[in-house]
A protein has these predicted regions:
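Short glycine-rich anion-binding loops that position phosphate/pyrophosphate groups of nucleotides
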Residues: 45-47, 183-184, 205-208, 240-241, ...
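Short, well-ordered alpha-helix to beta-strand connector turns
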Residues: 24, 37, 62, 78-79, ...
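Short internal beta-strands
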Residues: 63-69, 234-238, 376-377, 400-408
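Phosphate-binding loop of NTP-binding sites
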Residues: 8, 91-238, 242-250, 307, ...
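ATP-dependent carboxylate-amine ligase
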Residues: 1-15, 36-39, 251, 288, ...
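Acidic, Mg2+-coordinating active-site environments of NTP-dependent enzymes
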Residues: 10, 58, 71-77, 172, ...
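N-terminal leader/targeting and accessory segments in enzymes
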Residues: 1-93, 229, 263, 268-270, ...
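Active-site regions of enzymes building and remodeling cell-envelope glycoconjugates
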Residues: 14, 76-85, 150-153, 251-258
Length: 492
């Protein structure tokens, strides 16, 4: 239990009814979880406004209710009514207080940007743990607390859940947390209630703009920029054309990284490395640090991811040797993830599931000396048809051979989605085949692999399911590959 006054101590509010001399048994923002003695925070969601449940909360003898608009409570109710300007903002501070401000007991690292967040969080975790720290992680794929892995629903959880995860990290002995910070999370105040020790900006491209996300690119950029008003040390990629827009209202100390001479920490002399089953890139780190490094992931964007991690970890006094060792060993599920299937060609799994990501990935891989570039992909159902045309055209232009298959068809027919992709493919001279069953498509790619080929399984990445007509059926591409190899008597 916590005193209501204590939970409200960092908020500006008006007590419209009742008194503050109460004990609270729980903090609740889901109307289905209202219990006697709780503090119910009315949140406006996509499908339901918690203010509609205010009277119900009072009837169930909630200790207090936080609202941002007028509500009617039963006249006889003794529930305290608190009014604030923004209930999501209030929830963040109340949650931090409820869990005894766990972020103050951790070194907190928040990474925002259109691309690179997931990979960079794992690189930072790898480097810091290699140097002896215990690091929690919050991101798109999962939440990691000690040995516990929790499947992620959102890139950045709701503020109450985030504070609960922080508390569990402290309890498990973590001293640091690295997390992805989405623009939606910043817009919805999920990361309020504490100050990041480090805030990092990777890059910005038009994405997440639409009816259910951001109304415009300007709004998207503004939301990203909020991180630099909520951290002590800001670190920004100054090669990105938008970096000054993102940092112009910063309230933190600021340093930069990139490949240009103006960066405080720089990567130079890039060298592509291509060994059997391995695509990577080596580079020299100069400026704030000076050493030679290599990352076991291909492409210039991998250098940016590595450089971001180095820019963060240098503040932890990690040795150059520990950084180099961790970068070579780092592996991120579903992010340019190499899977050994042959001694003659390379196969990888990647989450590239939209036009921008697929184009970036295939363009990167074309920079390496190789045989054919083979792309196996599909598109999700009940999503933009335009994306299907575009991705078909991208693969047709960049891949030497495309195998079009099913992704998450959802409530559409896989064959109809494939036909849309083929429409885009036919705008090019690209060679393709369509195989709707994803396992059969992967098997075809492996069976027809040629010496020097690079085969990319794009779109599913870290996902371990296939969504068909409202049901998520188990399907992990690593398991599919293992089954295919076993059926052929191949082992590594």
């Amino acid at each position: 239990m916590k005193a209501l006054k204590e939970l409200l101590s960092e908020l500006i509010f008006t007590c419209e009814r009742g008194n503050l001399e109460k004990e609270v048994t729980a903090v609740v923002y889901d109307s289905r979880k209202i219990v006697e003695g709780c503090l119910f925070v009315c949140i406006k969601g996509a499908n339901f406004d918690g203010h509609q449940a205010a009277a119900e909360a009072a009837e169930k003898k909630a200790a207090a209710i936080i609202v941002s608009q007028e509500v009617e409570l039963p006249k006889q109710s003794e529930t305290t009514l608190i009014r604030v300007e923004d209930t999501r903002y209030a929830l963040a501070f109340v949650s931090a207080a409820w869990f005894d401000h766990p972020a103050k007991k951790l070194t907190t690292i928040g990474i925002t940007g259109t691309k690179g967040k997931t990979t960079t969080t794992y690189l930072v975790k790898s480097i810091l743990e290699n140097a002896g720290r215990k690091v929690g992680l919050v991101g798109t794929i999962e939440i990691i607390i000690g040995d516990t892995h929790i499947h992620a629903v959102n890139t950045t959880p709701e503020s109450y859940l985030l504070q609960e995860y922080f508390a569990k990290m402290v309890e498990s002995g973590c001293d640091t947390v690295v997390m992805e910070v989405s623009s939606q999370a910043l817009m919805l105040h999920r990361t309020q209630g504490f100050v990041f020790d480090f805030g990092i900006f990777t890059n910005l491209e038009p994405d997440h703009i639409g009816p259910n996300e951001h109304g415009s690119f300007e709004e998207y950029a503004h939301c990203k920029s909020l991180l630099f008003q909520q951290c002590r040390i800001g670190i920004a990629n100054c090669d990105d054309v938008h970096w000054q827009l993102i940092t112009k209202e910063h309230t933190c100390s600021l340093e930069t990284y990139g490949m240009s001479k103006k960066a405080d920490l720089r990567a130079q002399n890039l060298q592509f490395t291509n060994r059997q089953g391995h695509l990577g890139i080596a580079f020299d780190v100069t400026g704030l640090m000076n050493f030679h490094a290599e990352i076991a992931m291909p492409g210039r964007f991998s250098v940016y991811n590595a450089l971001t991690a180095i820019a963060i970890c240098r503040h932890f006094k990690v040795s150059e040797a520990d950084i180099c060792k961790a970068l070579l060993a780092a592996k991120v599920k579903g992010r340019i993830e190499m899977v050994k299937v042959s001694n003659e060609f390379t196969l990888m799994i990647d989450y590239a599931h939209n036009t921008m990501a697929l184009k970036s990935l295939l363009t990167t891989l074309k920079e390496y000396e190789h045989g054919r570039l083979v792309c196996v992909f599909g598109c999700g159902g009940n999503r933009s048809r335009e994306r299907r045309f575009e991705m078909g055209e991208v693969s047709g232009n960049l891949a030497d051979f495309t195998i079009i298959t099913s992704d998450n068809p959802r409530f559409e027919e896989p064959e109809a989605i494939i036909e849309d992709i083929i429409t885009g493919m036919k705008k090019t001279d690209g060679v393709y085949i369509s195989i709707p069953d994803r396992k059969e498509a992967i098997a075809y790619a492996i069976d027809h692999g040629q010496p020097g080929d690079i085969i990319v399984l794009a779109g599913k990445g870290h996902e371990d399911y296939q969504e068909i007509k409202g049901v998520k059926y188990p399907m992990d591409e690593r398991d599919l590959i293992a089954d295919i190899l076993k059926e052929r008597g191949i082992s590594f």
